[in-house]
């Protein structure tokens, strides 16, 4: 009954439509920001911070709203707080990224330290399976182990 309701109302399809839009927007966002920064292409950075990031956030917030409706229709509320934290964290991180770019473009900061650093390779011979450990890839800083 619940699955029929969700399909009939298009919620499942709407969710995946928004998910696809979010992933399409985020897939190479960091690479493009780094490239534009390295090339000092401030117009591209402005386009990203003022248009692309807000569009991704809008799609993500709508996706989150739809996902919550699906969850509450299909399951008990217990456990949804984990999706709140994860999706809310992505939204907050995108907002912070936009603010950092805007601060740079407005001259509030002269450089973006996080974009000056050499990128670490994703795979190395000594690497453990960190890509499957959210708690270990959320930051390059070890302070998150104390939270």
Question: What kind of feature is each model-predicted range?
Answer:
Residues 1-147:
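Catalytic domains of carbohydrate-active enzymes that cleave complex glycans
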């Amino acid at each position: 009954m619940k699955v029929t309701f969700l399909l009939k109302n298009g919620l499942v399809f709407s969710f995946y439509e928004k998910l696809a839009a979010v992933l399409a927007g985020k897939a190479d966002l960091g690479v493009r920001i780094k490239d534009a920064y390295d090339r000092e292409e401030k117009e591209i950075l402005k386009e990203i911070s003022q248009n692309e990031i807000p569009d991704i956030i809008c799609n993500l917030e709508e996706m989150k709203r739809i996902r919550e409706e699906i969850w509450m229709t299909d399951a008990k509320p217990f456990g949804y707080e984990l999706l709140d934290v994860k999706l809310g964290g992505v939204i907050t991180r995108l907002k912070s990224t936009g603010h950092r770019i805007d601060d740079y473009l407005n001259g509030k900061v002269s450089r973006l330290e996080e974009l000056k650093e050499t990128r670490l390779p994703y795979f190395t011979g000594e690497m453990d399976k960190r890509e499957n450990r959210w708690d270990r890839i959320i930051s390059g800083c070890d302070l998150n182990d104390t939270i």
